[in-house]
Amino acid sequence: MIKVPAYMYVLECSDGTLYTGYTTDVKRRLNTHNTGKGAKYTRARLPVKLLYSEAFNSKQEAMRAEALFKQKTRQAKLTYIKQHKNEQ
C-alpha cells in the first residue's frame, strides 16, 4: 500500500487571523477554502492565503501537529512559521 503524505497547513485570512488545518492535498484544500466551501471560520474571512504547510508521513501525525500548533499563541505560530520556512 502506498502511503499518501498528509499536511498541516496555516492560512492567513483577510482579517489577519490565522487558520490551521490538515489535508492530503494543500492546493485543493486552499481552493476549497477560497470558494467558500471550506471551514465555516474561513468562509466569513475570504480570501485566504497559504502561509505555511508541512508534510507528515500519516494523517495522524498531521492531526497531532495541527492540535499542538493550535495551542500556540499567535506570536509563537508566526515564529514557528518563520523558522521552519527556511528549512523547506
UniProtKB/Swiss-Prot annotation:
Which InterPro entries does the record match to this protein? GIY-YIG_endonuc (IPR000305), GIY-YIG_endonuc_sf (IPR035901), UPF0213_domain (IPR050190)
| Family matches, as SUPFAM superfamilies | GIY-YIG endonuclease
The family database entries (PROSITE patterns) matched by this protein are listed as: GIY_YIG
- Which superkingdom? Bacteria
Which Pfam family, an example, fits this chain?
A: GIY-YIG
Record domain GIY-YIG: where: 4-80
Record family assignment: Belongs to the UPF0213 family.
Q: What is the name listed in the Swiss-Prot or TrEMBL entry for this protein?
A: UPF0213 protein SAG0778
Q: Which organism is it from?
A: Streptococcus agalactiae serotype V (strain ATCC BAA-611 / 2603 V/R)
